[in-house]
From Swiss-Prot:
GO biological process: thiamine diphosphate biosynthetic process
Record EC number: 2.8.1.10
Key words, A-Z: Cytoplasm, Schiff base, Thiamine biosynthesis, Transferase
Pathway in which this enzyme or protein is active: Cofactor biosynthesis; thiamine diphosphate biosynthesis
Function of the protein: Catalyzes the rearrangement of 1-deoxy-D-xylulose 5-phosphate (DXP) to produce the thiazole phosphate moiety of thiamine. Sulfur is provided by the thiocarboxylate moiety of the carrier protein ThiS. In vitro, sulfur can be provided by H(2)S.
Gene3D superfamilies in UniProt: Aldolase class I
Organism ancestry: Bacteria, Pseudomonadati, Chlorobiota, Chlorobiia, Chlorobiales
Sites where the protein binds 1-deoxy-D-xylulose 5-phosphate: G159, A185, G186, N207, S208
UniProt-recorded name of the protein: Thiazole synthase
């Protein structure tokens, strides 16, 4: 079997699902089940025991075979992200933390310096750190060196649906990385998830593309199939590209005539 290894955890599914933007919790749960995802990310602010209508921890923790990965979305500094991570671990019991630090709400680009600092400290504290980062090969390597379990470069801006706009940089990150590379943000279509897996990504994280689809459970299942197909294609090894045509048939003879 071909498993995804993150720290001491082993997953058979390489599709990670986000939990934001769903119209209701029941639809979210249905989509998670349809996706076959085993790792699900949820914002700390959705851990709300007092306001049941806003709480996602209860419904998610009731699912069998699901590991929660809290995220620090909303943090604008390393200090805020570290504080959020401590609360999230206490509430969820999960060692995973997705470090998200994007101080500008206009573009939601991750702050590389603050992300590195928070990730360094949290990794020392024993968290399985999964940092959301710009598609920067140098930063990705630095995060690997401080003990992150994976790196999560953005395909394109959060919620933009622009797909793998950073494909070239992501390929460089994959080439140099000794930990799983997980494309996070910007994916719109299952074909883009397949393309990310064909490049050699360890997994993809999808949220908006499923949550705002016309039929979220069906779209979740489509992404699951695409991720599996892309991974199989990567393992089978794609044919090399060529700048000129290469005939699939011998050109030495045609109808008994030698060329």
């Amino acid at each position: 079997m071909d498993f995804l290894h993150l720290g001491s955890f082993v997953f058979s599914s390489r599709l990670i699902l986000g939990t934001g933007k769903f119209s209701n919790a029941d639809l979210m749960i249905e989509a998670i089940k349809a996706s076959g995802a085993q790792l699900v990310t949820v914002a700390l602010r959705r851990f709300n025991r007092e306001q049941i209508a806003d709480d996602l921890f209860g419904p998610l923790s009731a699912l069998q075979g699901i590991t929660l990965m809290p995220n620090t979305s909303g943090a604008s500094t390393a200090r805020e992200a570290i504080h959020a991570a401590h609360i999230a671990r206490e509430l969820s019991g999960s060692p995973f933390i997705k470090v998200e630090i994007h101080p500008n709400p206009q573009h939601l680009m991750p702050d590389a310096l603050e992300t590195w600092e928070a990730s360094r400290i949290l990794a020392k504290e024993g968290f399985l750190v999964m940092p959301y980062i710009p598609a920067d090969p140098v930063l990705a390597k630095r995060l690997e060196e401080v003990g992150c379990a994976s790196v999560m470069p953005l395909g394109s801006a959060i919620g933009s649906g622009q797909g793998l706009a950073n494909a070239g940089m992501i390929e460089l990150i994959i080439r140099e990385s000794g930990i799983p590379v997980i494309v996070d943000a910007g994916l719109r279509a299952p074909s883009e998830a397949a393309a990310a897996m064909e490049m050699g990504c360890g997994a993809v994280l999808v949220n908006s593309a499923v949550a705002v689809a016309g039929n979220p459970p069906e779209m979740a299942n489509a992404f699951a199939e695409a991720v599996r197909a892309g991974r199989r294609a990567f393992k089978a090894e794609l044919m090399p590209k060529s700048s000129f045509a290469l005939s699939t048939s011998p050109l030495t003879t045609f109808l008994g005539k030698k060329s």
